[in-house]
Structure formats: structure tokens, C-alpha cells
């Protein structure tokens, strides 16, 4: 007697909730943090999956834009300046992260139009 009952099938290999949802972010860890954080008395099974998907999407969006900013500056490594440029040049991300200060991010280059030198018209010859 093997002690496995009538079926006789071996237990399937454990599959993480992240891999089931097709995500890279940890669903189990987010679920644990939601339960621990006293956000609500109970946490549904779908809530951490949804939150992990949203966080993964936002991270991918910021990283893609920051990678483009790094490539524009002929750099192969993303630095805080590239994150700052990526976020502040994107309207929706800028609105979402308007209250966030990025250390070593610098500022966006911006010169008011009235401060620019006036265009002088050359005499026609």
C-alpha cells in the first residue's frame, strides 16, 4: 500500500500564482503584504493578482521610456536622470507621479519664450 488512496497519481509539481497569471511580479508576496498591512479584514484571491499585474505594467512602462531616454543620450545604463526625463515627458506618468521627487534626477530643460533672443530679419539683397 502506497497510502495515496485509489487514484494512485503522484502530486503535481507546485506552480506559483505568478506563473499561473503569466506575471513576473510575486503574487504571493503581494497577497501577504495586503493581509499584513491592515488595508481590509479580508483579501480576495483575485486582488493580489490584479495588483501585481498593475505594478508590473507600470514598471515596464517606466523602464521602457527610461531605456529610450538612455539610448537617446547614447548610454547603455539607466540612471536617475533618465527616469526623471522619462516620467516628466510623459503626460500621464507625470500626473501620476507629480508629488514624487527623484534623487539625482535634475530638472527638465525649459526656457521661457520671452527670454529667447529675438530673431532679427536680415536685409534682402
Curated annotation (Swiss-Prot):
Protein name: Histone H2A
Basic residues compositional bias, start-end: 1-18
Function summary: Core component of nucleosome. Nucleosomes wrap and compact DNA into chromatin, limiting DNA accessibility to the cellular machineries which require DNA as a template. Histones thereby play a central role in transcription regulation, DNA repair, DNA replication and chromosomal stability. DNA accessibility is regulated via a complex set of post-translational modifications of histones, also called histone code, and nucleosome remodeling.
MF (Gene Ontology): DNA binding; protein heterodimerization activity; structural constituent of chromatin
InterPro entries attached to this UniProt entry: Histone-fold, Histone_H2A, Histone_H2A/H2B/H3, Histone_H2A_C, Histone_H2A_CS
CDD domains according to UniProt: HFD_H2A
Keyword Disulfide bond: no
Subunit text: The nucleosome is a histone octamer containing two molecules each of H2A, H2B, H3 and H4 assembled in one H3-H4 heterotetramer and two H2A-H2B heterodimers. The octamer wraps approximately 147 bp of DNA.
Sites bearing N-acetylserine, chain numbering: 2
Nucleus as UniProt keyword: yes
Cellular location(s): Nucleus; Chromosome
Residues that bear N5-methylglutamine: 104
Domain of life: Eukaryota
Family recorded in the similarity comment: Belongs to the histone H2A family.
This protein's GO CC annotations: nucleosome; nucleus
Taxonomic classification: Eukaryota, Metazoa, Spiralia, Lophotrochozoa, Mollusca
Keywords: Acetylation, Chromosome, DNA-binding, Methylation, Nucleosome core, Nucleus
Region (Disordered): 1-21
Primary location: nucleus
Pfam families documented for this protein: Histone, Histone_H2A_C
Amino acid at each position: 500500500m502506497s497510502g495515496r488512496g485509489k487514484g494512485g497519481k503522484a502530486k503535481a509539481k507546485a506552480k506559483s500564482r505568478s506563473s499561473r497569471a503569466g506575471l513576473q511580479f510575486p503574487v504571493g508576496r503581494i497577497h501577504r503584504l495586503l493581509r499584513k498591512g491592515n488595508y481590509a479584514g479580508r483579501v480576495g484571491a483575485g486582488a493580489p493578482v490584479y495588483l501585481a499585474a498593475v505594478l508590473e505594467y507600470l514598471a515596464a512602462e517606466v523602464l521602457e521610456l527610461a531605456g529610450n531616454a538612455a539610448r537617446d543620450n547614447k548610454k547603455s545604463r539607466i540612471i536617475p536622470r533618465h527616469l526623471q526625463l522619462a516620467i516628466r515627458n510623459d503626460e500621464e506618468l507625470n500626473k501620476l507621479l507629480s508629488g514624487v521627487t527623484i534623487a539625482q534626477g535634475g530638472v527638465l530643460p525649459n526656457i521661457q519664450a520671452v527670454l529667447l533672443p529675438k530673431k532679427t530679419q536680415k536685409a534682402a539683397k
